[in-house]
């Protein structure tokens, strides 16, 4: 199910069931699954179109916002002196750009998601908003759409 519909579905379930929700990103879940003492984690998801979604995490959580871009523009460079564990299908797809300690085949884990959710405050479903790293693929031209024929 595409991301935009998934968030709407969860909001609807929360409203109907009168239950709160916990907002987590797949990058956070990947990072937690790869976390090792003292090593930062770079979570990388294949965004298609030759791009990746990625975010760096340290022992205290995210070290910056998630980004989207071509691997050669967002992957760690040779000047990065600190070792990093890289996880996610984006790193698998572009191994030439992610030469760190690579953990192939990782996907967000339901067990890790449940653990993280237990550590976060729950909020009403209508307060959870998706984070979009790029614009939608389709835009409706309202003027054209509502012109009588």
Regions found by a protein language model. Give the residues of each.
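DPxDG-like acidic metal-binding loop motif
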Residues: 1-21
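Short amphipathic alpha-helical face segments that pack within enzyme cores
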Residues: 8, 12, 29, 112-113
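Generic hydrophobic alpha-helical membrane-segment signal
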Residues: 8, 14, 34, 123-125
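A near-ubiquitous, low-amplitude feature marking generic local secondary-structure context
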Residues: 14, 97-100, 116
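Surface "functional belts" at beta-alpha junctions
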Residues: 19-109, 125-126, 132, 137-148
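Short, flexible loop segments at boundaries between secondary-structure elements
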Residues: 105-119
């Amino acid at each position: 199910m595409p991301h935009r519909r998934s968030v709407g579905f969860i909001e609807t379930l929360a409203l109907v069931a009168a239950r709160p929700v916990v907002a987590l990103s797949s990058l956070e879940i990947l990072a937690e699954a790869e976390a090792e003492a003292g090593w930062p984690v770079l979570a990388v998801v294949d965004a298609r179109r030759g791009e990746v979604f990625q975010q760096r995490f340290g022992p205290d959580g995210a070290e910056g916002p998630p980004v989207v871009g071509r691997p050669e523009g967002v992957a760690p460079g040779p000047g990065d002196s600190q070792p990093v564990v890289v996880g996610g299908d984006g790193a698998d797809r572009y191994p030439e750009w992610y030469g760190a300690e690579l953990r192939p085949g990782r996907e967000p884990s339901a067990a890790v998601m449940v653990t993280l959710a237990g550590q976060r405050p729950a909020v009403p479903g209508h307060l959870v908003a998706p984070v979009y790293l790029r614009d939608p693929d389709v835009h409706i031209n309202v003027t054209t759409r509502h012109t009588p024929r």
